A protein has these predicted regions:
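N-terminal "cap/leader" segments of large eukaryotic alpha-helical scaffolds
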Residues: 5-51
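Structural detector for internal amphipathic alpha-helices that build alpha-solenoid repeat scaffolds
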Residues: 22-31, 49-68, 79, 87-102, ...
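Amphipathic alpha-helical scaffolding segments comprising HEAT/armadillo-like alpha-solenoid repeats
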Residues: 31-43, 67-82, 102-116, 137-152, ...
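Terminal, low-structured helical/coil segments at or just beyond the last alpha-helical repeat
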Residues: 242, 246-276
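Boundary/linker segments of alpha-helical solenoid repeat arrays
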Residues: 189, 224-228, 264
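Repeat-solenoid scaffold signature
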Residues: 215, 220-233
Length: 276
């Protein structure tokens, strides 16, 4: 354990000898208050994940009850959620849940459900955090059921945040719902967010995103889709696969049909791909 100043508002930062040897920043960070520790380590995680992610996870328990959902911290959370490293996205979620006093327990789901049922502004972020909590293993079935219901709400803003919650939930059920919303939601803004949830945002892994490809290819045959939505489908295919065949539906299908099976259903895990 790295020594911390014995002053109010500071907590010792749990570390390891290996991490201490690698970074002189750790001792300095250990002297900060928990809020600043969390902010600084999340900031470091965006650029130096191997150095800081372990420290974040080892200190989450001691931070709980000492963090505020400040503008700065939430800005860092959103920044980390844009990382290409899924481990960084998970660390951001864990810190956000701690800052909002959401334990990994059914009681937290109940708390969010009450906020969602309210018609106040807090319901929007509650939808987002319900998905995040479900991704961390807390009642994912109930989270999906709630998010699916609100994804079809008459209020477009509610649907928007339910879509964001589905992307954060990041399981196979949410993929199916996001595909349906991409094809069928009446609002272009919602279709765009559904496409983004499938291709880039949220907590789906690369392997999970690939499972959406067959249905995306099926959507290319859907004459009910307008041109803008068809373009979204092509863009989503490109973002997920890294391939580029423009708007040539036949080329996309041929490529997928002959694509290496190991790429369609990868068994070799890439570093940092797991969200565990």
């Amino acid at each position: 354990m790295v020594a911390a100043d014995s002053q109010p508002g500071t907590t010792a930062l749990v570390s390891t000898p290996q991490v201490r040897a690698k970074s002189a920043d750790v001792e300095e960070i250990s002297r900060l208050a928990p809020q600043q520790q969390a902010e600084r380590l999340l900031e470091l995680a965006i650029d130096q994940p191997d150095l800081s992610l372990g420290l974040i996870h080892r200190n989450l328990t001691s931070w709980r009850g000492h963090l505020e959902d400040s503008d700065r911290l939430f800005h860092l959370v959103l920044q980390a959620l844009n990382s290409n490293d899924p481990r960084v996205r998970v660390a951001a979620v864990e810190i956000d849940l701690a800052a909002n006093n959401l334990m990994k327990a059914p009681e937290s789901v109940d708390k969010l459900q009450r906020q969602i049922q309210n018609s106040s502004e807090e319901r929007y972020m509650a939808l987002w955090r319900l998905g995040a909590l479900g991704n961390r293993g807390v009642e994912p079935t109930e989270a999906f059921r709630t998010l699916k219901r609100y994804a079809h709400d008459r209020n477009q803003e509610v649907r928007f945040w339910a879509v964001e919650g589905l992307a954060m939930l990041g399981n196979q059920e949410s993929i199916g719902e996001l595909l349906d919303l991409l094809a069928c939601d009446p609002a272009a803004k919602i279709r765009q967010r559904a496409a983004n949830g499938l291709s880039r945002s949220g907590l789906l892994t690369g392997e999970q995103r690939l499972t959406a490809v067959p249905e995306l290819l099926n959507l290319l045959d859907d004459d009910a889709l307008d041109a803008a939505t068809q373009n979204l489908v092509y863009a989503t295919l490109e973002a997920i696969t890294g391939a580029s065949f423009g708007k040539n539906a036949s080329a996309w299908r041929d490529w997928w049909a002959h694509h290496d099976t190991r790429e369609k259903h990868p068994t070799r895990r890439h570093p940092g791909l797991s969200l565990a």
